[in-house]
Amino acid sequence: MQPYHTLSRVLPFPDANQKAWWDKLGPMLLKAMQSQGYDTEAQYAQLGMVYKCVLPYLGEFPTVENDATRWKSFLCPYGIPIEPSLNISQGILRYAFEPIGPDVGTEKDPQNMNIIQDCLKGLTQHDDRIDTTLHAEFSSRLLLTEEESRQFATTGQFNFGPGQGMHGFAVDLKGSRPMFKGYFCAGIKSVVTGIPTGKLMLDAVREVDTEGRITQPLDKLEEYSANGIGKLMLCFMSVDMVNPHDARIKMYGLQQEVSREGIVDLWTLGGRVNTPTNQEGLELLLELWDLLQIPAGPRSVAISHCSVGQPPEYMLPTLVNWTLLPGHSDPMPQVYLVPFGLPDSHISDCLVTFFERRGWTDLARDYKKNLASYFPDIDFTQSRHVQEAISFSFRKGKPYLSIYMSLF
């Protein structure tokens, strides 16, 4: 804990909210980095970036007392504006966050858009490797214009529930140098324009991809998304903030009818992808699905946030993303199994069993111990919210899993 304690003694905190966020995030992120073998330089560098570039944009620190009045982020069921995750296959910690502006929810900033450029400026000043070219292209197409923002604000109250927002960032903590990507949610733009979310994003990608480098996988995804089972809905996308020729574009969807058959449909694009690698990955994905025993059935997307301090009030849809890459005719799937609402002890047991079957001895031995160290105040025999989702992908003959975690 030395880097956290050292920085806590020397860094100034301009207000109580930022100090509270630091005391919540700092120990958790540090313990996660230490458990994954980050060296001391990387620990200081990454905590320093959180202090400088993230804490000022997290808004009110969530409490039971302010839960009804604070701005709720689209990122998490509890409306928390930052969501850590751990790529346990590669030992990489990451987090996504939605910058929260000082005037959020008022007439000055009804959709929480005013702070985006200020936060982005801070990130680019911190790391000059960030390339904002594609971020700017998609911002101009998927964020509201000033006129649309005014129009939207006068049409009535919009339910800014889980998954219903505008924009966020994700940070991969690779050693001492982070990697960044931007998220764009198309739901509000769809309401304003009357254009379905999927079409908004697909059209934006085609316009930006002027050389047609990802036309093949994009065409295949568009055809599938119009016919996928389980009430599939494309809802947001992400883009790497690197040189455009090296950037990955990912399209995200929600499958509202959760089932084993739906998982197969997402992974194979309704049978359109049937390569040996795809089938090998599918076998492992279904093994994980069978272990977790997530109840099948319909899930609503028209939901409100859960209340801080209270157990989950619902279960969530299956999430998926497809990576679109030049030179790949098929979109590359990553399916998120979402056991949010099931006992955390059950989820941990299932994951350990999966690790043991893969021969991941160290991971199977340490997973529960490490998870408990990240959240020392949580009773994992009672909690049902910490391990929100488990993402699964399969690349070059290997499964890759990430665990998405709720801080509250």
UniProtKB/Swiss-Prot annotation:
Disulfide bonds: none annotated. InterPro entries: Aro_prenylTrfase, Aro_prenylTrfase_DMATS, DMATS-type_fun. Keywords: Prenyltransferase, Transferase. Pathway: Secondary metabolite biosynthesis; Alkaloid biosynthesis. Dimethylallyl diphosphate binds at R94, K181, Y183, R248, K250, Y252, Q334, Y336, Y400, Y404. One of its GO terms (biological process) is alkaloid metabolic process. Its EC number is 2.5.1.-. One of its GO terms (molecular function) is prenyltransferase activity. It catalyses: preechinulin + dimethylallyl diphosphate = tardioxopiperazine B + diphosphate; preechinulin + dimethylallyl diphosphate = tardioxopiperazine A + diphosphate; tardioxopiperazine A + dimethylallyl diphosphate = echinulin + diphosphate; tardioxopiperazine A + dimethylallyl diphosphate = variecolorin L + diphosphate. Belongs to the tryptophan dimethylallyltransferase family. Prenyltransferase; part of the gene cluster that mediates the biosynthesis of echinulin family alkaloid. The pathway begins with the biosynthesis of the cyclic dipeptide cyclo-L-Trp-L-Ala (cyclo-TA) by the NRPS echPS via condensation of L-alanine and L-tryptophan. The prenyltransferase echPT1 then catalyzes the first prenylation step, a reverse prenylation reaction at C2, to yield preechinulin. Preechinulin is the substrate of the cytochrome P450 monooxygenase echP450 that catalyzes the formation of the double bond between C10 and C11 to produce neoechulin A. This is Echinulin prenyltransferase 2. It comes from Aspergillus ruber (strain CBS 135680). The lineage of its organism: Eukaryota, Fungi, Dikarya, Ascomycota, Pezizomycotina. The gene is echPT2.
